[in-house]
């Protein structure tokens, strides 16, 4: 696809549908009750908007572009996993290209980004009848697709995920 610009490596969470029945305010303490799985994922991204300045906190956490696909890696049962300061990287051995990152680039840590999204869902009174994913933002940034092949993303202590770009 000629509009595909790059890929991002992210932490994603599977949230239980019980979250929508929760009538109290979501917080860091009760947030963990609604997370069933955690996984590394690759987001294949396309067109990006150019934002001029930041007008709100949401601008820092919002993705202003067209996402083409999410590839979710192996899910791990969530057991209060610490993803605050984990090294990450995306590599393509075919073209000898590696980009290094860290999970702390996302709103200090991915759990903060998750909390922000869930608070917004609660505030807007969104309802849904099944479990759902929340993708918490890039730990590596948009890595340009410089060639075809398999791009492998690794988040230390969490796992790896691969996407074939052809």
Regions found by a protein language model. Name each.
Residues 89, 121-125, 130:
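Extended mid-to-C-terminal alpha-helical interaction segments
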